[in-house]
Amino acid sequence: MKRVWLRAAALALAVAGAVAGLTVYFSTENIPRCLVSGVDTWRPPTDGRTHRYEVVILDGSACFFDMDRQQRLVGALPLSRAQWLAVETPAASDTLRVTDTDHGVVFETRRGLLGVRALDLRTKRRLYVTRFKGFTWNPRFGPDPPSHGLSLAPDRPELWVLDAPNSVIHIFDVSELPGAPPRRLEDVRLSKPISGEENPCKRACGRIGSLLHSADGRFVYVGDAGDVIDTRTREIVANLEALHNSRVQLEVDWVGGKAAFPGRK
């Protein structure tokens, strides 16, 4: 009986070692850039036209998706070779804020709040706390802050808020602020849940989400879910696997031979 147990233990250790070895192999050697095989190295356009890109940062590479070509992946670039891009990469934050200068308010999400706060831009006095009616959250599970994504539409008075535990985006009309609270317009269910871990990933791998409007207001990009939403129809028009495994994203426009970063300050 002891010999059988020792053999079983040895076999278990061997299997565990093999699985660990395979995990390391597949995570470091066999995963292509941007999770797509045969991706070309991105090169700046030379045709003189304006090109708009959704750029996803994944495993040390910048993945360039062409906004005007149905979100097509057109190339990748190691961040180590693109300092001009690396310095513009947004940092992570537990408290997300967006400023609406037209209405003199700041929208904020924070730990422990499944919802969004509206503050007076000048005094920072709290005006409203808007919660997501009909949605709940268990603080012991899921990301905190749970509303880990805020984005103001650049072309209309709309605030988009990511409800990560429920994998839903809540859209609000904010045209009446500061006189009246945000008015709920619609809830958009994501095609993939914001749960589990990003892969490949080296640290802070749990999916928590992010939101980004394109500078022209046509699309919203959802980090850690990968969805691209048409803001006119509020329908999902694409899913980017790189964005499903990253929440770090920004828009890069190539204009007149130079990079521009709309929305970045």
What feature does the model see in each segment?
Residues 16-265:
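Predominantly soluble domains enriched in secretory-pathway, periplasmic, or organellar proteins
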Residues 1-18:
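N-terminal Sec-pathway targeting helices
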